[in-house]
Amino acid sequence: MKIWFLSLAAVLLSSCSSDAPVAKAPVKPPEAETGRQGFYKTFPQAHTWAVDAQPMRVRSIEMKELQADGGKAAAWEVSYASEAKGRSRVYTWSAVEAEGVHQGVFASQEEAWRPGGADKPFPIQALKIDTPEALQTAIEHSVTYFKNLGSKPHPKFVLEYTARYPNPSWRVYWGESVSTAEWSVFVDSATGAYQGR
C-alpha cells in the first residue's frame, strides 16, 4: 500500500512540475546611431586587432532599410590604422542586415598602410563633437543652400584629417558622395567650430 501511495504521489508531483512557458522580452526595433556611437561600437574589436589602433576615417552609411535623421545613420564605417603592424583595417557597424552590410560589427581584410601617407590617423580624444552637433553647426552656416527651394538630399558625414585644417573635421555634406555633393561644411571635431565650406 505504501509503495502504491508513493508511486501515485511521484506521478502527481511530476505532472505538476512541468515548466510553464516563459514570456520572452519583446525584440527591440533597430535604432540608428550617431557617429560617435558608431565609432565606439567598432572600437573594442579594432583594439583587439591592434592595441595601438587609431581611427583614420568615420563615415556614415545610408540604408533604405532604416531611415535616420538628426545626425544619425543606420550604419557606420570606421577605418583604423596600426603603426606597429603597418596595416589598416575597416570595421562596419550596422543596426540592420542589408545588402553588403551585416548587422552588428564586422571587420574587413587588413591592408598595407604606412605613416605619412594620405590617410592620417587621429587620437580618439579628438572626437569630442558628435554628428548631431556637427549637423546643427553645418545647418546654421548653410543659409544660402537652404534658401534654394526644392528637396534636399539626406545629410551624410565623414570624419577625417584634411590638408585644409589642423584638426580632424566632420564634413557634413548633402549629396550622394563627397565629390558630387551639392553642399558641404567642415566642423572641427574637437571644438565644434565652423571651419568653412
Predicted segments with their positions:
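Sec-dependent bacterial lipoprotein signal peptides
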Residues: 1-14
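Long, terminal "pre-/pro-" and other extracytoplasmic accessory regions
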Residues: 16-197
